[in-house]
UniProtKB/Swiss-Prot annotation:
The lineage of its organism: Bacteria, Pseudomonadati, Pseudomonadota, Gammaproteobacteria, Vibrionales. This is CAI-1 autoinducer synthase. The keyword ATP-binding does not apply. Its EC number is 2.3.-.-. SUPFAM superfamilies: PLP-dependent transferases.
Length: 389
């Protein structure tokens, strides 16, 4: 039986993607897909910063909860907002970070999109850092808000935009997922107060790795009570597929009934909430892992900077700036051939000629591996067939 043919307007678009995203590369695959790593390679592609994904206590709690589960909650979380239905992990996460309220979501993407859809009216001014996560941009678009991008971490530019357009919502990441830079959170709080703006901080890449007991950068800086909203993907340090919204107001009462991602997606299941509870307990007592991760990240940042590479990172995320796609392909292949595997960030995550190979460190990385990465990058700098920006 013949398969149905796609209409030309779809087929032409797919042909364009295949030609420009796949066929153009040497291996015939997308640029993010390089060689297959071996067990001896240094793999820095995961966001599991405290190396908890295979923790035996978390696995045991998930298995036990799943085996004991008797409920059938395959429904929207909108129907489960009575106090007796809500998972205890929400109160524990609120206490952990110092916020009044926490609401679980199916992902960090859903948390950001749903929150902005809830709090924005059409034409609300959303002042968004140029490098903020795409889910924050999409949330503003969902709400028909007016997005005003400001230059990365440039508070003077932000002030100028607010003076021009009026109050709105300031939207930033605490740690940026491509370059590993840290937002000037204290100054952003001051700006939000000065101009009557709300402030939303996505702590996806700092929750668990920074702050007292891993409570995040806002907690570390004593700013929790000064910020209106915090969000996070729990698919980073928490090593699970979930997200959350924190607030110091009543917005989380409304999100489950206004946010399309909340209404039209099924709730997290009880065994998943139980797994998150155990993960939180481990994160709270993981100071040794956090300290080791910080030491390894500092050592690698210093070592790469001494090679003359442009390293803007202030965290465990380190971006090697590799320019255009053909050069990025060469750098990727060289690193992988020498046992170092990072994540390629290219269009649409970056602009076409500003690609990045991201090295995401975790607490299992050791001194010998850091030395190896620096050695491979040193050889790469002198190789001559490609360049670093």
């Amino acid at each position: 039986m013949n398969k149905p043919q796609l209409p030309d307007f779809i087929q032409n678009k797919i042909d364009h993607y295949i030609e420009n995203y796949f066929d153009i590369n040497k291996n015939g695959k997308h640029l993010v897909l390089g060689k297959q790593a071996s067990p001896d390679d240094i793999i820095l592609q995961s966001n599991d910063y405290l190396a908890l994904a295979n923790h035996p206590l978390i696995k045991a709690r998930l298995a036990k909860s799943l085996l004991e589960e008797q409920q059938s909650l395959f429904m929207s979380a909108s129907f489960l907002q009575n106090d007796y239905d809500k998972p205890m992990i929400e109160k524990r996460l609120a206490k952990f970070t110092g916020f009044d309220e926490c609401l679980l979501s199916q992902s960090g993407w859903n948390a950001n999109v749903g929150l902005l859809q809830t709090i924005c009216q059409p034409n609300t001014n959303v002042y968004i850092d140029f490098f903020a996560h795409m889910s924050l941009w999409e949330g503003a678009r969902y709400a028909n808000a007016q997005a005003h991008p400001f230059m990365h971490n440039n508070c003077d530019h932000l002030r100028m935009l607010i003076q021009r357009h009026g109050p709105g919502i300031i939207v930033v990441d605490s740690i940026y997922s491509t370059l590993g830079t840290i937002a000037p959170l204290a100054e952003l709080v001051n700006i939000s107060k000065e101009f009557g703006c709300a402030l939303l901080v996505d702590e996806s890449h700092s929750l668990g790795t920074h702050g007292p007991n891993g409570a995040g950068l806002l907690a570390e800086l004593g700013l929790t009570r000064e910020v209106h909203f915090m969000t996070a993907s729990l698919a980073k340090t928490f090593a699970y597929r979930a997200g959350a919204i924190w607030c110091n107001n009543e917005v989380n009462r409304c999100v489950p009934f206004i946010s399309y991602p909340a209404i039209f997606s099924s709730t997290l299941l009880p065994y998943e909430a139980a797994g998150l509870e155990t993960t939180l307990e481990i994160i709270e007592s993981a100071d040794n892992r956090r300290q080791h991760l910080d030491r390894m990240a500092r050592k690698l940042r210093i070592g790469l900077s001494q090679l003359g590479l442009t390293i803007r990172s202030e965290s465990q995320i380190i971006g090697l700036e590799t320019g255009d796609e053909r050069n990025t392909e060469k750098v990727r292949d060289y690193l992988e051939s020498n046992g170092v595997f990072g994540s390629v960030f290219c269009r649409p995550a970056t602009s076409k000629n500003k690609n990045i190979i991201r090295l995401s460190l975790n607490s299992d990385v050791n001194d010998e591996q850091i030395a190896k990465i620096i050695e491979v990058c040193s050889d790469a700098v002198n190789y001559g067939d490609f360049y670093f920006r």
